[in-house]
A protein has these predicted regions:
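Hydrophobic/aromatic beta-strand patches that form the interior of the parallel beta-sheet core
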Residues: 129, 160, 220-222, 295-297, ...
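Active-site catalytic motif of lipid deacylating hydrolases and related acyltransferases
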Residues: 120-192
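Serine-dependent carboxylesterase/thioesterase catalytic core
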Residues: 132, 159, 175-282, 326
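Glycine-rich, phosphate-binding/catalytic loops in enzymes
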Residues: 145-148, 211-214, 238-241, 313, ...
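Catalytic metal-binding/acid-base residues of hydrolase active sites
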Residues: 134, 165, 227, 298-300, ...
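C-terminal catalytic-base region of ester-bond hydrolases, centering on the histidine
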Residues: 41-46, 74-80, 288-385
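Short aromatic-enriched loop/helix-cap "lid" or pocket-rim segments at secondary-structure transitions
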Residues: 142-143, 231-237, 305-310
Length: 385
């Protein structure tokens, strides 16, 4: 229903553009023929304005109310530029292009999922456990993984979440995850789990599997944009920011997150464990477990401006210290395991740290994040996991 309304709105806006162009030509011709008597011409002009206004507002309201991809940015640009002659036409054409592409893209996805519904290509032998990264939580109504879990479930996946705190040391987060794994296996009798972990969650998961006795409950561990070798820029920042400032920020964060459900958040411990020096120590002791399949997914932005705030600001800093990156984690640091996947798209866009968890619910030309995870999980199924 939403896509149909959005598509109808785009069609009305296209009709508006074409009919407006033809109406201008018509009014010019009739004005020339009726000169100097403009009485009839005024009637024609009023009729055109009324009809075009009806078509335009009918279309733009439908698009504004149903498009998910326009976002605040293009809605604001559309409103602001609506009062600027000629510029408003370019803005309107951009709005039509974005909304039309969304309609076509989502309609094709619906058709694909419908055709393969009976195949259950994501029905893995063992359920999926999603593990979030630092400074986020698993909220019921605001999914950390965006539209990805719903897409996987439609294709047969059984999904659980880590439900651990937003910020803690790798050791403490690992303990929470180990407890969660035992809980899921004990309650469901599923035997094992396939972990998919993002960012610091990958370090937490590696520690839990290697050090906390849950290796027999884990079939595979897929890390996504995880800084396995740390972030050198984090070492630099921690060395430059005064201790008083670090403690002030940590106190404010810890206090705020307790109100959101964290029992014992530790901002500084979480940040310290992301440094290159800490990750080196981790890698010396946290070894891969034979019998557990390890793989990684990494991505990179192509230019800083293609990342959403704050990744567009952090990208140059990370690039200076660590090389090509996703806005936070370098591609060299994200690789781990038997299968190392590196992602980007052509042009200036690239794929950011947030894009790989569908943080902004944005459709990216050349990369379908939901389908990527469908194929990733399908691969786990085909491997017997």
């Amino acid at each position: 229903m939403r896509l149909r309304i959005c598509g109808d709105g785009c069609e009305l806006l296209i009709i508006f553009l074409i009919s407006s162009f033809l109406s201008v030509i018509y009014l010019i011709v009739t004005a020339y023929r009726t000169f100097p008597d403009f009485g009839l011409e005024l009637i024609h002009l009023l009729a055109v304005i009324i009809v075009e206004a009806i078509v335009f507002w009918n279309g733009i309201i439908r698009v504004y109310c149903t498009s998910m991809q326009l976002g605040i940015k293009w809605r604001f640009i559309g409103i602001f530029c609506g009062w600027l002659p000629l510029v408003n036409l370019f803005a309107l054409m951009k709005i039509i292009r974005v909304a039309s592409w969304e309609t076509n893209f989502e309609s094709e996805k619906i058709a694909v999922n419908k055709n393969r519904a009976n195949s259950q290509i994501c029905r893995t032998k063992y359920p999926i456990l999603f593990v979030h990264g630092v400074f986020f939580r698993d909220y019921k109504y605001l999914n950390y993984w965006g539209r990805i879990p719903k897409e996987l479930i439609m294709n047969g996946a059984v999904i659980f979440y880590g439900n651990h705190q937003s910020a803690a040391s790798v050791i403490d987060s690992g303990k929470e995850l180990a407890e969660r794994v035992r809980q899921i296996v004990g309650e469901t009798g599923c035997g094992k789990l396939n972990i998919i972990a993002h960012s610091k969650g990958g370090l937490d998961s590696r520690y839990a599997v290697s050090q906390l006795g849950i290796e027999n409950y884990i079939a595979s561990l897929t890390t996504v944009n995880t800084p396995h070798y740390g972030c050198q820029f984090a070492d630099y920042l921690l060395s430059k920011v005064p201790e008083s400032t670090r403690n002030f920020i940590a106190q404010k964060y810890n206090s705020a997150l307790k109100k959101f459900g964290d029992s014992n958040p530790d901002f500084l411990a979480a940040v310290n464990d992301l440094t290159a020096s800490s990750c080196k120590q981790l890698n010396d002791t946290v070894l891969d477990i034979p019998g557990v399949f390890y793989q990684s997914v990494g991505s990179k932005l192509n230019v800083a401006s293609s990342g959403r705030f704050p990744l567009n600001f952090s990208y140059p800093l990370v690039k200076y210290f660590d090389g090509e990156n996703d806005g936070l984690v370098s591609t060299s640091s994200s690789g781990w395991g038997e299968n190392r996947i590196k992602l980007t798209v052509k042009g200036s866009r690239g794929i950011s740290h947030g894009d790989l968890i569908d943080l902004n619910r944005e459709n990216i030309e050349g990369f379908d994040v939901r389908e990527f995870y469908v194929q990733l999980v399908k691969g786990l199924k085909e491997s017997g996991f």
